[in-house]
Structure formats: structure tokens, C-alpha cells
């Protein structure tokens, strides 16, 4: 399956059409596989998303010992894409869509795209 030319627009368009057809407030993630520095194998990641808080900033929240977190940001859309990748497969499984139900996370209109996960070149440890 080929990726859309504009994944960001496509995620929004798919979400709007399915929301209208199903009458449900849903989120969309378009994913692809990638390699990672210092790790073997590929993993799914969120190429684009819509109606989903893609990055969850937990700075200031308490950890399991009651200590405040200082720099924890969760790549929430990537975590969902990786989980979906287990079901979609990476070769000839031909399962291009995974539905995740019962996820109790808030929808987010402003921080709603996986492009928000791209970090500045100056903060990137691998460039």
C-alpha cells in the first residue's frame, strides 16, 4: 500500500468522512515502518494523525515514588502506531487498518498531528 502524498491532509479527510458516516468522534493515525538508531528491526510509527494528542507532556506529574517528572514526554501517537503494527504486520499480512476501541484518552484539536513529534534539529541526538 502506497502512502498518501499529504498524510496530514489525508488523516483529516479520513477522520471527517468516518466521523460523519459512523456518527462517532474518532481519531486517525497513518503509520509507516522505520528503523531506529542503535536498534535492529523495524517498528511502526505515526506518520500523521488527526484528532489525537500526539505528544503528551508529563513534566511535573509524579512518578511511582512521588517524585516530579522532569523531562518526560510520551510519543502517544507513535505508541499506538507501534501497537497497531503488531496486528498489521510488516510484510504480506495485508491488514492496512487496525481499530483500537476503548482507549480513554482525550481528543485534542490543537496538538493533533504526528508532525508535532518531529524535534528541532538542534535537539536531535542523532544528527
Model regions and ranges:
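Internal active-site segments that recognize and position negatively charged phosphoryl groups
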Residues: 1-45
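A structural signal for small-residue-enriched, beta-sheet-centric alpha/beta enzyme cores
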Residues: 26, 30-127
